[in-house]
A protein has these predicted regions:
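Short, structured segments at the rim of ligand-binding sites
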Residues: 1-431
Length: 431
């Protein structure tokens, strides 16, 4: 699908943030194993969460879908209904449920799709190997097969690549036989780890933070085996990752301000860092009872480290195109194993719109030089966050056509509907 986004001034001053797929996927995973029925209200309808529910059912959980709620009846030990799981294009789904699959005493295959077929899964295989689990067929284009069962162990792991495997390990090891001690080095996305710990605690799982050195990115965790998650009722928090695009839109296109609601946070979210990034970039915002209010204005410049919140690169790279001075975004190395190679895609696609982007792997930075934005046709490269970022260039700069606009369904299906409700002019392009 190709959409054309035209320069627009917002005509409405309030929008609700989408539900957090990061929170919901963690709840689904634990609810799959939990004793009793977990009731999820305000669920995310993203493709990633749809696939997470499919995998929960494939592992033996019973799923009931309501109008604005989902009920999950967990089962443990797992009773897989199929020999394979279908994560779709979800990196978290692959790694989280790939580790849960190791709780089963037998092989289960992870059927990857789309861009996920080319993403690196060596971290999953290496981590599971440390706990006696073999993973076969991990090359690009292959469907990994996990051979459980997983057992507790004392291990040292490199956690520099992603926090997603660690999330799966914490969920699974609590239910495995034997206790575990995880000595983690190079921990990235610490806020995502914290989110996992908080969801685990709410569902009755104890994980002890024995020691932490934040400066050295080292973390020592103790997980007692033989636990069982407890069902709970939970309303899914609003998603700061999706809200970041709405907040950027408010800065660039609101006549005065934009209220982004539904952002009361039960759990830690890495991308809440968008608030600090905007403030340091000279933007004005204030808290409200239900979320945040952003004021319209021209950003000065962004100088921010996004190592722990790499999903903020696309919205900030779009905002930076309209700043007064060049912006420097640190954490470039985190962008290579996403739905696209986001660093290079931002560089190549922004160039089509007349925006120069420099990538420096030595300093781990992306430098975005401000506009003016030129009319162009950009490709999402099948990446939901690139489609949303391209829409910001069109709404605030010059007409932008977006190839593959449907990619937003991965995390924020009604993104373009929400933009239109705010007054952004969007046209469907034939062909």
């Amino acid at each position: 699908m190709i959409l054309r986004v035209l320069p627009s001034t917002l005509t409405s001053d309030t929008v609700w943030a989408p539900p957090s797929k990061s929170v919901m996927q963690r709840v689904i995973a634990l609810a799959t194993l939990a004793d009793g029925r977990t009731m999820i209200s305000r669920p995310s309808e993203s493709d990633d969460c749809t696939h997470a529910l499919m995998m929960a059912a494939q592992l033996g959980a019973d799923i009931e879908l309501g109008e604005d709620a989902v009920a999950i009846h967990g089962t443990f030990p797992l009773k897989p209904r199929e020999t394979s799981l279908t994560p779709g294009e979800s990196g978290l789904g692959l790694r989280l449920f790939g580790v849960l699959a190791a709780l089963h005493d037998g092989p289960l295959t992870l059927e990857r799709a789309g861009s996920l077929l080319q993403r690196d899964v060596s971290g999953l295989a290496e981590a599971l190997d440390a706990f006696g689990v073999k993973v076969q067929h991990t090359a690009p284009g292959e469907h990994p097969t996990v051979h459980g069962p997983i057992r507790g162990a004392h291990v040292s792991l490199d956690a520099a690549g992603s926090s997603q495997v660690l999330t799966g390990l914490l969920c699974a090891l609590a239910h495995a036989s034997g206790d575990s001690l995880l000595n983690l080095h190079g921990v990235v996305s610490r806020p995502y780890v914290q989110m996992t710990l908080e969801v685990l605690e709410d569902m009755g799982i104890e994980v002890d933070v024995v020691e932490e050195d934040a400066d050295e990115r080292q973390l020592l965790l103790r997980v007692a085996g033989g636990q069982r998650a407890k069902a709970m009722d939970v309303a899914i928090d609003g998603d700061w990752s999706g809200a970041a695009f709405l907040m950027a839109l408010g800065v660039l296109c609101a006549p005065h301000h934009l209220n982004v609601e539904g952002l009361h946070s039960t759990y830690t979210q890495a991308d809440e860092a968008i608030k600090g990034a905007l403030l340091f970039g000279g933007c004005r915002l204030a808290g409200t009872d239900e979320g945040v209010q952003v004021m319209a204005g021209k950003p000065k410049s962004f100088q921010v480290d996004l190592t722990d919140s790499p999903d903020l690169f696309p919205p900030l790279a779009a905002l930076a195109a309209f700043a007064k001075k060049p912006s420097s975004l640190r954490g470039l190395h985190r962008l290579g194993n996403k739905e696209s190679n986001r660093g290079r895609v931002i560089q190549s696609e922004w160039a089509k719109a007349g925006i120069r982007v420099d990538l420096n792997e030595t300093t781990d930075t992306m430098v975005v030089h401000p506009g003016p934005v030129q009319s162009a046709r950009l490709s999402s490269h099948g990446d939901h966050r690139m489609a949303m970022a391209a829409a910001l260039l069109g709404a605030a700069g010059a007409p932008i056509e977006i190839e593959g606009a449907e990619a937003v369904a991965k995390s924020y299906p009604p993104f373009f509907d929400d933009l239109e409700s705010l007054g952004v002019q969007i046209q469907t392009v034939a062909g």
